[in-house]
UniProtKB/Swiss-Prot annotation:
Taxonomic source organism: Olivierus martensii
Enzyme class, broadest EC rank: hydrolase
Activity regulation: Inhibited by heparin, and to a lesser extent by DTT, Fe(3+) and Cu(2+). Not inhibited by reduced glutathione, L-cysteine, EDTA, Ca(2+) or Mg(2+).
Location of the EGF-like domain: 352-407
EC number: 3.2.1.35
pH note: Optimum pH is 4.5.
Record-stated family: Belongs to the glycosyl hydrolase 56 family.
Record protein name field: Hyaluronidase-1
Length: 410
């Protein structure tokens, strides 16, 4: 009994100190960003969700534009002259090794000025290049053509070389070219719009397509982690990381609730491992199951957003394509899902993340539950002001603060 009283008193003291410190501290900033072309619903069918979203603290571009003041995404045809191969032929030279990087950067500069006219843009900027991968070994399936043609380029210069020699140099030339293209493009957007958080969509990946009855079975394999370590140049230069944790229909049919949580945790765990202290992390999440017109089950949406928050991350990007809003029926379904699921869940998670930050982390970081990595999301989806116990929590500190509760100034 005495011990319980002492623990209660200690908690109250820490809580009071946290509230006092919060007066002058910077609040945790958990951002949920809307990246769905819902403007199509507004224009075609007079179905608007902006007020619903913004009233629940979800960030929406002004006038619902797909690219705007909160978020901008550059697809393959929108930033410079991105070289890649399509079924109907080569685009912008096809192969990185023989394409004009200088011209690409020149045109990209104009694209950036057009798409982001405000030099003080401080939203999230995403480069979405998916036609090839920078590491040789991951250009499989339809991407294997990049490997074949890279070897052809080397063989044309050195027809007397052995296949092993050709492949060795082809790998070096491909990976060096990919690094140069990705880094110089990233540096350009960061130089031109330095206040934004910049990332490449889908990076890092975990390729964790299988798993059974243990959480560790879903973790990124050692060889995947070693490959991701080879991209250290990308993690160092990126000011944000934007992995995908899209819920698939196969996840619902193949995995139970715990397994789905393990799968997502594994991908976020790898992102955290690779991130630098000041790197922001904004995972991409979805509300429509890819390849279908079915919405993500409401409990899964709650868990996913709660997981992101409970790992101390900076927010999430809710994505949807024009395909999801091209009929009145789809627009009505979107509005219903926003009203019943997205808006209340986002509002609750944002509020709980910020409240825990103020109470436990002095407003200098976000709460993390180290001993409950797979279930701590439940604390953040509770709309009834749950109690946060400092004994269960460590803080992911920001702004140079350190210590378990960010109590040590930089």
């Amino acid at each position: 009994m005495t011990q319980n009283i002492q623990m209660t008193e200690m908690y109250q003291i820490i809580l009071f100190a946290s509230i006092l410190a919060a007066i002058s501290a910077t609040s945790a900033d958990f951002k949920v960003v809307w990246e769905v072309p819902s403007i199509m619903c507004s224009k075609k069918f007079k179905i608007n969700v902006t007020d619903l979203l913004t009233s629940h603290k979800i960030l929406v571009n002004q006038e619902e534009t797909f690219n705007g003041d909160k978020i901008v995404i550059f697809y393959e045809s929108q930033l410079g002259k991105y070289p890649h191969i399509e079924s109907h032929g080569d685009i912008n030279g096809g192969m990185l090794q023989v394409s004009d990087l200088a011209n690409h950067l020149k045109i990209a500069r104009d694209n950036i000025s057009k798409f982001i006219p405000d030099p003080n843009f401080n939203g999230v900027g995403i480069i979405d290049w998916e036609a090839w991968r920078p590491l040789w070994k991951y250009n499989w399936g339809r991407m294997s053509e990049y490997r074949d043609r890279s070897k052809d380029l080397v063989k044309a210069k050195h027809p007397d070389w052995s296949p092993a020699q050709i492949e060795k140099v082809a790998i070096e030339e491909w990976e060096n070219s990919a690094k140069e293209w990705m880094l110089k493009t990233l540096k350009l957007v960061e130089d031109m719009r330095p206040n934004a958080a910049w990332c490449y969509y889908l990076f890092p990946d975990c390729y964790n397509y299988g798993g059974k009855d243990q959480p560790s079975e879903y973790f990124c394999k050692n060889d995947i982690q070693e490959a991701n370590d080879k991209l250290s140049w990308l993690w160092k230069q990126s000011t944000a990381l934007c992995p995908s944790i899209y819920m698939q229909e196969s996840h619902i049919t193949k995995y139970n609730t715990s397994q789905r949580a393990w799968w997502i945790y594994a991908r976020l765990r790898e992102t955290i491992r690779l991130s630098h202290p000041n790197t922001l992390i904004y995972p991409y999440i979805n509300y429509i199951l890819p390849g279908t017109k079915k919405t993500v089950p409401s409990m899964d949406f709650k868990r996913v957003l709660g997981q992101i928050g409970s790992l101390g991350l900076d927010g999430a990007i809710i994505w949807g394509s024009s395909y999801h809003v091209n009929t009145e029926e789809m627009c009505k379904e979107m509005k219903t899902y926003v009203k019943d699921v997205i808006a209340p869940v986002a509002s609750t998670v944002i509020q709980n993340v910020n409240r825990c930050s103020q109470q436990i982390c002095k407003g200098r970081g976000n709460c993390v539950w180290p001993e409950e990595p797979y279930t701590s999301w439940k604390y953040l989806i509770d709309p009834k002001n749950p109690t946060f116990k400092h004994t269960n929590i460590s803080c992911k500190c920001k702004g140079g603060y350190t210590g378990r509760y960010c109590q040590i100034a930089p």
